Every structure is written in C-alpha cells, then in structure tokens.
C-alpha cells in the first residue's frame, strides 16, 4: 500500500486528498482572516510580488489550488484597471473554497472573464497547450503526488508557457529560523483554535510546511517534470519562495 505524508502522519496515498479537503472545508469561512493573522499581513505583499511575475495580462491564465481566489482576483482587478483582455480559470479540488472565491468575485464585481473548475492538480480537465501561465500559491505542498501535478502543469501550458509557484520554504538565517519555527509550532495552531476553532487544521499546516522540500530540492523536481529555465526568488528570508520555469 502506497503511503504519503499528511503533516507528520503517514497515511494511505488514496486517503490524503480527502483529509486535506476536510481541513480546508472546515476553515473555509475563516481562511482569509487566518492568513492575515498568521502572516501578520505579509501574505499580501508576497502575493503582490507573485503577480508581478506575470507581465502580460492579455493571456490565458490557470490558477490552480485557487482557494479563496486571492491570486486570480488580484490579477482580474489589475487586468480590469489596465483594460486588458484576460482569461482566468480558477481551479481547486475543494468546492467550499471555490465558493468563497466566487462570492469574493461577485462582491468585487470581478466575475467577468472568470471560469471556475473543481479539479485535482494531478488530473486537470484541460487539453494540452491550453494556457500561457500556470499559477499556484500555497497549494502545491497539499497535493498528494507533487511530481504528477508538476507534469500536469507542464502539459497544459503552451510552448514557452510560464509556471509560477509561491510556496513556504526553508528559512536561511539562524535567528529568523529559530523564531519562525517557534512561532509556527506554538503560536499558529493556537491562533487557529481561537479564530477558526480548529487547532488540528493548523497543526497540519505547519507540519506540511516543515516537510516541504527546500528551494533547491523543489527546483530539481520542477526541472525533472520537463521545465526549463527553472529558478526561484526568496522572500522574507526564505519564509516563502517564488519558483518559476518555462515549458519548451
């Protein structure tokens, strides 16, 4: 029986996605608030830097593990302000999270040119060579088979399409590393209990971050999936990193 990690626990590979779905379904309505509290608002700056990696908004963009839609809606607003003809597809395996994204899109009057698809990052329901950009923010570490998801990203991108991934990473500096580890394992789950009423969900979160490959290890995984010009940029001392690559 194939096993994989669900946080620090070993679980049957076929059960991981259901467990992850339960985590996000249970915290969907507090997801955005928790992001602000856990990151002290830094996630907004990280995401702003992330979308700057997309210079051409007259494009077909796929946002995978879209969650509550932060990345896609930032792009949609930027495109609207610049009168660009953007086509955005928001994909997430968790329907409850996509419902949050749809609600936000309606509230912000950004629903035009958006498509919503419930789908696994491992099996995307799109033809080969469909998109100019593939974005995924804080989602790839939750996928049961990351290598399979990376190959799917390569498949659905057009030639010279760009893959961009924002993910928690490995902190380099010692004093920041020590504080970050203490904050992650002691403070974040407590905030999760107080705000979302779910300590276990945020214990999973910090455990999944701790187990995620280093910047260089993930760079090799992206390259092995078939991408070229693979690189990364650390933000906030390596708390997160933006990974980018191109298809052939």
Swiss-Prot record:
Pathway: Quinol/quinone metabolism; menaquinone biosynthesis; menaquinol from 1,4-dihydroxy-2-naphthoate: step 2/2; Cofactor biosynthesis; ubiquinone biosynthesis. GO terms for molecular function: 2-methoxy-6-polyprenyl-1,4-benzoquinol methyltransferase activity; demethylmenaquinone methyltransferase activity. Coiled coil: none annotated. The keyword Methyltransferase applies. S-adenosyl-L-methionine binds at residues 68, 92. InterPro entries: SAM-dependent_MTases_sf (IPR029063), UbiE/COQ5_MeTrFase (IPR004033), UbiE/COQ5_MeTrFase_CS (IPR023576). It catalyses: a 2-demethylmenaquinol + S-adenosyl-L-methionine = a menaquinol + S-adenosyl-L-homocysteine + H(+); a 2-methoxy-6-(all-trans-polyprenyl)benzene-1,4-diol + S-adenosyl-L-methionine = a 5-methoxy-2-methyl-3-(all-trans-polyprenyl)benzene-1,4-diol + S-adenosyl-L-homocysteine + H(+). Gene3D superfamilies: Vaccinia Virus protein VP39. Its EC number is 2.1.1.163, 2.1.1.201. Keywords: Menaquinone biosynthesis, Methyltransferase, S-adenosyl-L-methionine, Transferase, Ubiquinone biosynthesis. NCBIfam families: MenG_MenH_UbiE, PRK00216.1-3, PRK00216.1-5. PANTHER family: 2-METHOXY-6-POLYPRENYL-1,4-BENZOQUINOL METHYLASE, MITOCHONDRIAL, METHYLTRANSFERASE. Methyltransferase required for the conversion of demethylmenaquinol (DMKH2) to menaquinol (MKH2) and the conversion of 2-polyprenyl-6-methoxy-1,4-benzoquinol (DDMQH2) to 2-polyprenyl-3-methyl-6-methoxy-1,4-benzoquinol (DMQH2). This is Ubiquinone/menaquinone biosynthesis C-methyltransferase UbiE. It comes from Rickettsia rickettsii (strain Sheila Smith). The gene is ubiE.
């Amino acid at each position: 029986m194939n096993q994989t990690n669900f946080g620090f626990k070993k679980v049957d590979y076929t059960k991981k996605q259901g467990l992850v779905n339960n985590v996000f379904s249970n915290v969907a309505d507090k997801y955005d608030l928790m992001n602000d509290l856990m990151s002290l608002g830094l996630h907004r700056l990280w995401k702003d830097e992330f979308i700057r990696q997309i210079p051409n908004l007259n494009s077909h963009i796929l946002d995978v593990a879209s969650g509550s839609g932060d990345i896609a809606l930032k792009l949609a607003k930027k495109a609207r302000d610049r009168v660009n003809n953007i086509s955005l597809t928001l994909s997430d395996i968790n329907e409850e999270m996509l419902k949050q994204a749809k609600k936000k899109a309606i509230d912000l009057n950004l629903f035009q040119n958006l498509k919503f698809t419930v789908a696994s990052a491992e099996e995307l329901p799109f033809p080969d060579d469909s998109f100019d950009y593939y974005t995924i923010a804080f989602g790839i570490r939750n996928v049961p088979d990351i290598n399979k998801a990376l190959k799917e990203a390569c498949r659905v991108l057009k030639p010279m399409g760009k893959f961009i991934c924002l993910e928690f990473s490995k902190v380099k500096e010692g004093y920041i590393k020590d504080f970050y580890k203490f904050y992650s394992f002691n403070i974040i789950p407590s905030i999760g209990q107080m705000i979302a009423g779910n300590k276990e969900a945020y214990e999973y979160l910090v455990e999944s971050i701790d187990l995620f490959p280093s910047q260089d290890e993930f760079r090799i995984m992206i390259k092995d999936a078939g991408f070229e010009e693979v690189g990364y940029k650390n933000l906030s001392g390596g708390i997160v990193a933006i990974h980018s690559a191109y298809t052939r």
